[in-house]
Amino acid sequence: MSIGRFSAGIAALIFSPGTRRYLLLRRSQQKDYAPGIWECVTGRVDQGEGFGDALHREVREELGVDVQAEYILGTTHFYRGAATPENELVGVIYLCSLDEAASIQVSKEHTEYRWLTANEAMDLLSSTDPSTQWTKRVIGRADTIRPMLSDDLVHYLSETGFEFG
């Protein structure tokens, strides 16, 4: 087996428990990958950084707020463009909570944000591109899993964290 290179990343789907709405961001038209699409917070893990630290750093950079990581929705593996080693990315997807009244300041990576119910998000995410379809699957999973989890389990997971060091 040959040793290759890939990047690690995170995604943060942010949920407002009080309104049961999800936060979506529109990517800047200046972005090199998937410009103008609606997405959740995404970003790369820096060298020497854990997934949890990357999650909180990326959310602060993109939104100017801190979130509570509630649980891991899943993992992802994709190519950011052509299927070449330099475009390969593996990542962890978190569901995070944030009060909708929080003062969000979007970075230059995005042009706007919206709080949407799952149904509203599905309507907005009408493009057939792979990134949009991925975001739809993430929201669909979150909206299915969240009601199944007990408050005690979600509290335990959010308080103890996810990394074992």
Sequence positions of predicted segments:
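Short loop/turn microsegments at loop-to-beta-strand junctions
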Residues: 9-10, 50, 111
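Active-site-adjacent beta-strand/loop module that shapes the phosphate/pyrophosphate-binding cleft
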Residues: 77-103
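A generic structural micro-feature
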Residues: 2-6, 34-37, 84-90, 110
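Nudix hydrolase/Nudix homology domain
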Residues: 108-165
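Short, well-ordered beta-strand micro-motif
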Residues: 14, 93-97, 115-117
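A short coil-to-beta-strand element that immediately follows conserved catalytic motifs
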Residues: 66-75
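Conserved N-terminal beta-strand and adjoining loop/helix that marks the start
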Residues: 1-23, 95
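Conserved Nudix-box catalytic region and its N-terminal flanking loop in Nudix hydrolases
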Residues: 20-61
